[in-house]
């Protein structure tokens, strides 16, 4: 479920997959399950961020308002012509080395590559512990309704982040509806999270299947980067914009 400005921007983001960029976060989840409007695009890549190549492939980013510009983080606000409302935030994060536990998927329109539902749940469970925002709880509840098991998501997060993620801590946080704007979380989502936590079973062992976030050989060709191999070992803290 994308707002009109985001939908209008989608074709301009087409080169992202060929650059090896994989969509994570709320927008990736919304594209799968359509549960809420998410207004940001958060792209991850395991390689160092090649800014010059990024801007060459998507020159509209170069004329956007820069919100953050660091070696492995580039965030801009894009004003979409003829669409009133706030700009669309596009973020690209490099050197994301936690890997993936599922197979990335291509969106129905063939434009973008997104993380698997299991990877999306695993990363959401981790970022939920770093901030108190209702949208994270909404995203997790939507994935549970869509059939992703909480236990599998906890196992995925443990595989991706190692000792930096403790399943019991996440289970407690899932039913602690205080802090930030979590108070506005709807009752249906609260009830679902409480029931799911209460009935949670053993957390399975989940393995990291690849250090490459994208899917070489998928429907969209992924071009190689020239910035060297990814740094071994996982990043224990995902970028918060997820």
Q: Where does each model-flagged region fall?
A:
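Compositionally biased terminal segments of proteins
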Residues: 1-242
